Amino acid sequence: MSIYDIKVTDNKGNEVSMSDYKGKVLLIVNTATGCGFTPQYEGLEKMYEKFVDRGFEILDFPCNQFAFQAKGSDEQIHEFCTLNYNTKFPRFKKIKVNGGDAAEIFKYLKEQKKGRIKWNFTKFLVDAEGNVVDRFEPTTKPEDIEASVEKLLK
């Protein structure tokens, strides 16, 4: 199985195949709007704007598993991120990242880069061939990931 075999649901309820992202470098992040790390949205958006034209995407998966910090509907979360951080990268339906009912995408990511997700804003870097090449803890700021992204872009 590869990451491209997985299907996810966007924040409007549409099914999206991860194969739509073949050939792109991806940063997949579990997020929350009420977390101490929420201001990382600003750095994520800056990185997105810097690299999107070179084949880079950030995939935002809100998660309410950690201290219930992603409250509200998918629409409310999207509105919060757009109004407060002007984010333009793709946002998906709120999911779980740990446990038996974790989203398939996060089960896969954790198989590739071992370990439970401990908090919001854990980041997984995927190369253009679909390989999960790195995992960054929530304390890693987006600007500290830019060099790793740059190396993967053609």
Where are these regions (language model features)?
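N-terminal "domain-start" segment that seeds a small globular fold
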Residues: 1-19
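Conserved helix-turn-beta segment immediately C-terminal to the redox Cys motif
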Residues: 24-25, 34, 38-64, 82-85
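Amphipathic alpha-helical repeat scaffolds
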Residues: 10, 30-34
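Thiol-/selenol-based redox modules, centered on thioredoxin-like
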Residues: 104-107, 111-154
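Thiol-based oxidoreductase modules, predominantly thioredoxin-like and allied folds used
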Residues: 55-72, 88-99
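Short, internal strand/loop/helix patches
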Residues: 75-120
